[in-house]
Regions:
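N-terminal secretory signal peptides that target proteins for export/translocation
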Residues: 1-7
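Short sequence/structural segments immediately N-terminal
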Residues: 5, 21-467
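Bacterial N-terminal signal peptides
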Residues: 9-22
Length: 467
């Protein structure tokens, strides 16, 4: 009898242990995240569920991207960003047709809601108001307005509308338009240019840097995000960065950076060893706050024909003082460098801008103006005379490379791609100009200048109808 009781007790005890163990295993399993799982049962309106289920089948790439985003983790759905009012100018009429489909469970009128295909900074501002305000006042958001004021390709119609749509406007942004049937004009869409003029009146595109539908802070912090537009012979910032010591450190140690640190906390020496574009121009550092206004922290407009202080840049004058902004940039630099190092770097950079202005640009501009005044060059159209091209590339290509290279400490770009080429271009330009003056002869004009058919009317959405 005693042996039976002992055996029974052991069986009961073992069973209890198994039950407890199984419960612990179940609890542990419940606490383990499942790979790429997204649970739509979490308090979502039926319209949002319809979006997710439909796009999961129709566009699995979009769904997968979103499902792995912070938006999804925070229960921010397609509907939250794309929802619109029926009277909004950017409502997608095409999307209404999806609610007339019989092959989809959610393709019925029960789930019909107005949505906008284009998500704009105005939409993003519902959750990111500060970022939207900062971005709206930046050069990025206003770049379409800037280029229409200074760019001869647009002002004089020297390239075609197709060349603009597939080239210039992809980065600078286009003016979104609709066709007669209410769909987006294919000459203006798709477009994620930083200065895009949206149908709801807002400026820009957040997806220029935070691409849809992941909207990753990691992606925006990496220099490659900036390099999609800031590259090439006229603004090679990505190439310049990669040549610099900062780029060297990024190449060697970038895979060790904590790219997903919370905004405002991304810190030198903690999350990264060397800065990227975002660190210097946008991220918080020391007492300097994070900003989506890339106009800040600049003491020169060195992409302009003549280097000027940002507050004196006529197409888009900064509302802040360059000395204040230089102080912010120095504060960023001092997270990794001593005061003498930082101060001496900017002394040289200031001198580079002054030297470019006085030695190269001003004398060349004076000769160009003299040639126009004497009637030896025709200013009605730019680029159709060789000396106009020479002058343009002196500042727009070589001059920029010299200034940008000095700003980011890339000596090969400052000298061989910059000032060395400036010298060659300057000599070629001035010799050509002096020859015209000496012989009092007009320059040869390219009669068959190709594709000079672009619309020269400045967009009313930017400048108004009275200008």
């Amino acid at each position: 009898m005693r042996r039976y009781l002992i055996t029974s007790a052991l069986v009961v005890g073992l069973a209890s242990l198994l039950v407890i163990a199984s419960m612990m295993t179940l609890a542990d399993a419940q606490n383990q995240p499942k790979a790429k799982e997204f649970r739509i049962e979490r308090s979502m309106p039926k319209e949002a569920v319809a979006c997710i289920e439909c796009h999961k089948m129709e566009h699995p790439g979009i769904f997968g991207d979103w499902a792995n985003s912070r938006h999804a983790s925070a229960n921010v759905t397609c509907y939250d960003c794309h929802k619109a009012e029926s009277f909004d100018p950017d409502v997608s009429k095409e999307h209404y047709k999806q609610y007339e489909r019989r092959d989809l469970k959610y393709g019925t009128k029960e789930y019909k809601v107005p949505v906008a295909a284009v998500v704009t900074p105005k939409d993003c501002s519902r959750c990111h108001p500060d970022e939207a305000k900062q971005y709206a006042r930046s050069k990025h958001a206003n770049t379409h307005k800037i280029i229409w004021q200074i760019d001869p390709w647009l002002k004089l119609g020297m390239n075609s509308d197709l060349e603009r749509a597939t080239g210039c406007f992809h980065c600078h942004g286009t003016v979104l338009k609709k066709t007669k049937d209410g769909s987006l004009d294919p000459m203006t869409w798709p477009n994620v240019g930083v200065g895009r003029i949206n149908l709801d009146g807002s400026l820009g595109s957040c997806t220029s840097c935070h691409t849809r539908h992941r909207f990753s802070v990691m992606e925006a912090r990496k220099p490659e995000a900036c390099g999609q537009c800031h590259l090439g012979p006229d603004h090679p910032q990505i190439e310049i960065f990669m040549e610099s010591k900062h780029g060297d450190i990024y190449t060697a140690f970038g895979d060790e950076y904590n790219w997903n640190a919370a905004p405002g906390t991304w810190s030198a020496g903690v999350d990264f060893r060397g800065p990227t574009c975002a660190v210097c121009h946008m991220s918080g550092a020391g007492t300097v706050l994070t900003s989506h206004d890339v106009t800040e922290r600049l003491a020169w407009e060195s992409q302009a024909p003549l280097s000027v202080r940002p507050e004196n840049f006529k197409p888009f004058p900064a509302k802040v003082n360059h000395e204040t902004e230089r102080g912010k940039m120095k504060e960023v630099c001092k997270q990794c460098h001593g005061k003498v190092w930082v101060d001496d770097h900017f002394v040289k950079y200031d001198k580079v801008n002054e030297a470019y202005n006085d030695i190269y640009f001003k004398p060349a501009k004076k000769m160009l103006d003299d040639l126009y005044a004497k009637g030896l060059l025709d200013k009605s159209k730019f680029f159709d005379e060789e000396l106009e091209v020479e002058f343009y590339e002196l500042w727009h290509h070589e001059g920029r490379r010299a200034r940008f290279g000095a700003a980011m400490m890339a000596p090969d770009y400052t000298w061989w791609h910059g000032f060395y080429e400036c010298k060659k271009r300057f000599v070629s330009f001035t010799e050509g100009g002096n020859d015209l003056i000496k012989h009092n002869k007009k320059a040869y004009k390219a009669i068959d200048f190709p594709a000079a058919t672009g619309n020269t009317t400045r967009p009313a959405q930017v400048f108004g109808t009275g200008k």
